[in-house]
Amino acid sequence: MAERRIIAIASGKGGTGKTTVAVNLASVMEGMVTYADCDVEEPNGHIFLKPALNTGKAVGIPVPVVDSDKCTGCGSCAQACRFNAIACVREKVLVFAELCHGCGGCVFACPSKAISEKEHGIGVVESGYSNHLSFVQGRLRVGAAMSPPLIRAVMESLPSGGNVILDAPPGTSCPVIAAIKGSDYVVLVTEPTPFGLHDLKLAVETVRQLGLPFGVVVNRCDIGDDRVGDYCREEAIPILVEIPDDRRIAEAYSRGEVAVDAVPGLRGVFMQLDQRIRECTTTLNALKGGA
C-alpha cells in the first residue's frame, strides 16, 4: 500500500470555496483517494460526492460525575479545571458538560475520590464510498460545542495509505488546528478581496506557526484586485492555481454537482492543482532527505 499523504484544504474564513476545491480535487485524483470532511459543525461534502454511507460510530468524551456523599466541597476540582467546566458554589459542585475537554484533571485533583467519569456523546463518524473515493465525515451533535475530539476521531478512522483530501473547518481557531496539524501539505483557499486577503494573512500565520508547507488557490480570481497576488509574491508563497469566476460553477454548486463534471475545462485546472501539489511535496521530501 502506498504511503499516506494528507492534503488539507483550509481557508481563513467561510465562503471562499474551500469545499468546492476539496471535492473537485478529490474527484480528479487517481489511485487510492479518501475524502475526509472535518468541518464537523456543518459537513457538506456529501451533498456533492453523494456517498453511500454504511458505517457510523458514536463519539464521546468522558465528563465528570460527582458523588455528593463523598464530596466535601473543597473546590480542588474547580481550581484544577482550566476550561471552567466545573465550579464549586456554596460547597456544591456544578458540571458544565459542554465546556469539558475530557482531560480528567478534576478526577486526579479530587482528594476525596468523589469524582468519576461517564461518556458524553458529542457526535458521530460516518464512512462509506462515492465512486472511486473512500468517504469519511464527522457530524457534531446539535448543541454540542466541543468539535476537536470529533475531528480527532475522524483522523483516527483514516486509512493508512493513499491520498487523503481533508476538508478542514473554516477560520483559524482550535478546530482548524486539530484538523490540519498532521497534514503533509495545506492548500489555503482565498479570493482577491480585502476580506479574503485579511483572512488569508491569518491563515498563513497559523500554518507557519505549525511549521506546515502550504500554497494558495485563488478562487474567483477575476472579481477583485491584485493585492492577494502581490502579498503572495512578497511572502514567497506559491499560488498553485487560479479558478475563474464562472457562473456555470455556481450553478453546478447550487445543484449539488461536482463542478469538474459540469464545466468543460475545469477538470484541467484541478488536475494542474494535483500536479502542483505533487511537485511541491516531492521537492519538500527531497530537501528533507538531503538534510
What residues fall within each predicted segment?
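Cysteine-centered iron-sulfur cluster-binding motifs in ferredoxin-type domains/subunits
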Residues: 65-84, 94-113
